[in-house]
C-alpha cells in the first residue's frame, strides 16, 4: 500500500507541471518578442527534437538505473535552465541551447513517469488498472492545460514574460511533489551491475526487445506517426489563428476547449476500449483524426475539427499506452518506453521544420494542407499494418 501514494502524487504532479502558460504561445513569443522568422522557429523545434532523438534512450537508462525520481528531477532542472534562457536572452544561438535543455527536460520525464506509475501498480498487483489510471492522468493533464490555455490568453495580453515566471513557479511545486514520491525497488539489481553489464542490459537488451517484438515495434511507430502531425498542427495554430484575426483571449479559449474535450476523451478511453476492443479503436480513431485534419483547412469551421482532434488524440494516447506497457518488462520499462519518444522525435525532426518552411513560403494554410496529406499517408500505412495482422501478439 506504500506505493498507492505514488499514484495520487503523480496526479498532483501532472496537474501542477502542466499548468504551463507558455505551452501554446512560445512560438508566438519567439515571433513577436524575439522577432524570429517561422523558419528559425522551425529550426529551434528541430533542435529540440534532435536532442530528444539522441537522448531518449540514454535518459531512459538513467531512469532505470539511478531511479525514476532522479530522472524526473533532472528533467525539471533542465526546464528551469530553458525558462531562464527564454526570459533573458534574445540571441538565436543561446536560445538554441535553451531548446537543447528543453529537449532534455522532456526526455528525462518521458518514460520515467509512466514507468514509475505502472510499476507502482504492479507492485500492488493492480497493473490491470493502468489504463484507467492513465486515463485519469490524461484528464488531469488536459484539465491543467485548459486552465493554463484560457488563462494564458489573458496573461500574455498583459506580458509574455509573466507567463514564463508563473510557469516557473508551478515547476517548483512539481519538483517538491516528485521528492515526496517513493522509488520502486526494481532498480537495486541494476545499481550493482558493472558498467559493461549495465550497458548491455539497458541498451542491447532494450533494443532487442523493442525491435524483435513485432507488436511492440509497430505500436510504437504508429504512436509516433499519429502524435507528430497533431503536435505540429497544435504548435503552429496560434500563428495561424493570429492571421485569421483571432485575439489572444480567443486563442486561449479555443485551445482550452481543445484540452477540455481531450480530458473527456481521456476519461472515456478505457470504457470505449472495453466496448469496441483493439482493432476497432485502431481502425476508426485515427480515421476520425485524418478527417479532422482535412476539415481544419476550412477557416470558418476550424474550431470544431480542432476541438475534436483533442478528444480523439487522448483516447488513442491512453489506449496505446496500455497496449505497450503490457508488453514491456519492468526492469527496462523506462528505456523501452523511451523508444516511443525517440520515434516521435524522428518524425517531428522531419515534419515540423518542413511545414515551417512551407508556411514561410506559401502560408500556414498550405502547410496544413501538406500536413493533412502526410497524415492520410500515415493512415494508409496503419491500414496496411492492420490488414497484414502485424499487431498479432508473439
Identify the function of each model-found stretch:
Residues 2-54, 213-256:
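Helix-loop boundary and gating motifs at the non-cytosolic
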Residues 164-171, 175-194, 384-394:
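Helix-loop junctions on the cytosolic side of multi-pass membrane transporters
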Residues 279-320:
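C-terminal transmembrane helical hairpin of 12-TM major facilitator-type secondary transporters
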Residues 32-33, 145-167, 243-244, 350-368:
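Transmembrane alpha-helix termini and helix-breaking/packing motifs in multi-pass membrane transporters
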Residues 1-4, 183-221:
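Juxtamembrane intracellular "pre-TM" segments in multi-pass secondary transporters
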Residues 54-67, 156, 264-278, 359-360:
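Helix-to-loop junctions at the C-terminal end of transmembrane segments
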Residues 77-90, 287-299:
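C-terminal ends and interior cores of transmembrane alpha-helices
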Residues 100-142:
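Cytoplasmic helix-loop-helix junction between adjacent transmembrane helices
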Amino acid at each position: 500500500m506504500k506505493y498507492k501514494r505514488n499514484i495520487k502524487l503523480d496526479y498532483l504532479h501532472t496537474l501542477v507541471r502542466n499548468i504551463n502558460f507558455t505551452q501554446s504561445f512560445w512560438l508566438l513569443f519567439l515571433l513577436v518578442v524575439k522577432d524570429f522568422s517561422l523558419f528559425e522557429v522551425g529550426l529551434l523545434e528541430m533542435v529540440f527534437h534532435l536532442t530528444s532523438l539522441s537522448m531518449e534512450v540514454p535518459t531512459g537508462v538513467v531512469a532505470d538505473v539511478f531511479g525514476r525520481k532522479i530522472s524526473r528531477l533532472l528533467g525539471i532542472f533542465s526546464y528551469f535552465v530553458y525558462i531562464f534562457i527564454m526570459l533573458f536572452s534574445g540571441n538565436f544561438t543561446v536560445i538554441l541551447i535553451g531548446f537543447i535543455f528543453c529537449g532534455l527536460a522532456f526526455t528525462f520525464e518521458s518514460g520515467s513517469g509512466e514507468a514509475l506509475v505502472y510499476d507502482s501498480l504492479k507492485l500492488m498487483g493492480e497493473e490491470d488498472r493502468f489504463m484507467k489510471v492513465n486515463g485519469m492522468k490524461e484528464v488531469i493533464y488536459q484539465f491543467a492545460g485548459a486552465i493554463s490555455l484560457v488563462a494564458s490568453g489573458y496573461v500574455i495580453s498583459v506580458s509574455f514574460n509573466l507567463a514564463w515566471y508563473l510557469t516557473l513557479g508551478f515547476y517548483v511545486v512539481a519538483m517538491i511533489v516528485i521528492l515526496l514520491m517513493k522509488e520502486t525497488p526494481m532498480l537495486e539489481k541494476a545499481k550493482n551491475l558493472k558498467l559493461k553489464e549495465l550497458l548491455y542490459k539497458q541498451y542491447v537488451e532494450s533494443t532487442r526487445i523493442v525491435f524483435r517484438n513485432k507488436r511492440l515495434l509497430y505500436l510504437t511507430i504508429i504512436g509516433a506517426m499519429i502524435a507528430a502531425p497533431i503536435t505540429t498542427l497544435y504548435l503552429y495554430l496560434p500563428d495561424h489563428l493570429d492571421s485569421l484575426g483571432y485575439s489572444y483571449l480567443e486563442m486561449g479559449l479555443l485551445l482550452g476547449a481543445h484540452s477540455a474535450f481531450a480530458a473527456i476523451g481521456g476519461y472515456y478511453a478505457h470504457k470505449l476500449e472495453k466496448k469496441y476492443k483493439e482493432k476497432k479503436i485502431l481502425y476508426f480513431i485515427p480515421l476520425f483524426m485524418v478527417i479532422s485534419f482535412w476539415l481544419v483547412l476550412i477557416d470558418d469551421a476550424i474550431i470544431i475539427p480542432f476541438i475534436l482532434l483533442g478528444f480523439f488524440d487522448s483516447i488513442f494516447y491512453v489506449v496505446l499506452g496500455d497496449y505497450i506497457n503490457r508488453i514491456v518488462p519492468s526492469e527496462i520499462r523506462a528505456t523501452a518506453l523511451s523508444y516511443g519518444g525517440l520515434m516521435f522525435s524522428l518524425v517531428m525532426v522531419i515534419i515540423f521544420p518542413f511545414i515551417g518552411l512551407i508556411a514561410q513560403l506559401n502560408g500556414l494554410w498550405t502547410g496544413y494542407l501538406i500536413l493533412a496529406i502526410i497524415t492520410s499517408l500515415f493512415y494508409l500505412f496503419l491500414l496496411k499494418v492492420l490488414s497484414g495482422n502485424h499487431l498479432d501478439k508473439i
